[in-house]
UniProtKB/Swiss-Prot annotation:
Residues the record lists as binding NAD(+): L19, I20, D39, E100, K105
Coiled-coil annotated spans: none
Keywords: Cytoplasm, NAD, Oxidoreductase, Phosphoprotein
Pfam families given in the database record: 3HCDH, 3HCDH_N
Modified residues (Phosphoserine): S6
Superkingdom classification of source: Eukaryota
Family membership noted in the UniProt record: Belongs to the 3-hydroxyacyl-CoA dehydrogenase family.
Subunit structure: Homodimer.
Alphabetical GO biological process terms: D-glucuronate catabolic process to D-xylulose 5-phosphate; fatty acid metabolic process
Cited PROSITE patterns: 3HCDH (PS00067)
Keyword rRNA-binding: no
Designated name of the protein: Lambda-crystallin homolog
């Protein structure tokens, strides 16, 4: 079996042909890997391949296609498959992308466990399901982990690597190297935790944003500006810990200077919101003024978002670290 560090990439199986699965297929193909895109419904695979061709051609025309290969070369590396054993055969890595349902994913990994060899990595794209629940009882558990991407993975490079308690260190190392090879930014979680790292941070922000709107402190539109034109601009380049470090004479100076103030404010934070009722309706109406919730407007806004993310990714790539 080829390894991510070899000169000739091997094969990757992507299980699930939805938006996340298609993004993974594009990423692996951009680095020269042969990709088998599996779905239990053959029509879904056919539709996915048509969608991939359209998107990759558009990316090439706009100059945002990743990798050194042209769109046609990358597309030639992606094939559809509706037989799971055939999809996995010869693969160095399997990336699962089925809907976020524990029983569905457990059933799939039980099938993969029966046909996997002792070398292939079995990876889930789950955003919140714990590896200890996903991979419990599998014979190949040492080869299993979660590799959680950020939506959309083609435009946002972060991938959280979350091991099962029995995952072999080499499995994490190989997956880390593979993610780097396809242009992603992997981070290692040293142990599993509910929500992983990204969603725990995201949910903390969402909860306080909701409370501020619910308590009449700020409007939904202005709340979003606090992030998009404030914190978000910094966080696109440096994280919260480095921000602290730079906003004083180092981290210890920041903690000494602002620690008591932070604790005072944090003690005023309210309980976990219900995310329903009058506040939900208020936020919904405010969002619909900006982006109506019909399919056409939402798709157009997502396309605008993806274009912004791609331009930002290119800018970050050009800037010195």
């Amino acid at each position: 079996m080829a390894s991510p560090g070899s000169s000739a990439p091997g094969g990757v199986a992507v299980v699930g042909s939805g938006l996340i699965g298609r993004s993974w297929a594009m990423l692996f193909a951009s680095a020269g890997f042969r990709v088998k895109l599996f779905d239990i419904e053959p029509r879904q695979v056919t539709d996915a391949l048509v969608s991939l061709r359209k998107e990759m051609k558009m990316l090439e025309l706009s100059g945002y296609l990743k990798g050194e290969l042209g769109a046609e070369e990358q597309l030639s590396l992606i094939s559809g498959c509706s037989d799971l054993r055939e999809a996995v055969e010869g693969a160095l890595h399997v990336q699962e992308c089925v809907p976020e349902n524990l029983e569905l994913k457990r059933k799939l990994f039980a099938q993969l466990d029966k046909i996997a060899d002792d070398h292939v990595i079995l990876s889930s794209s789950s955003s919140c399901l714990l590896p200890s629940k996903l991979f419990a009882g599998l014979a190949h558990v040492k080869q299993c982990l979660v590799a959680h991407p950020v939506n959309p993975p083609y435009y946002v490079p972060l991938v959280e690597l979350v091991p099962h308690p029995e995952t072999a260190p080499a499995t994490v190392d190989r997956t880390y190297a593979l993610m780097r090879r396809v242009g992603q930014s992997p981070v290692r979680l040293l142990r599993e935790i509910d929500g992983f790292a990204l969603n725990r941070l995201q949910y903390a922000v969402i909860a306080e944003a909701w409370r501020l709107v619910e308590e009449g402190v700020v409007s939904p539109g202005d709340l979003d500006l606090v992030m998009s034109d404030g914190l978000g601009l910094r966080y696109a380049f440096i994280g919260p810990l480095e921000t602290m470090h730079l906003n004083a004479e180092g981290m210890l100076s920041y903690c000494d200077r602002y620690g008591e103030g932070m604790k005072r404010v944090l003690k005023t934070f309210g309980p976990v919101p219900e995310f329903s009722g009058a506040t939900a309706e208020k936020v919904h109406q405010a969002m619909c003024v900006k982006v109506p919730d019909d399919a056409e407007h939402l798709a157009a806004r997502r396309a605008w978002r993806d274009g912004c993310l791609m331009r930002l990714a290119q800018l970050k790539h050009q800037l010195p670290q």
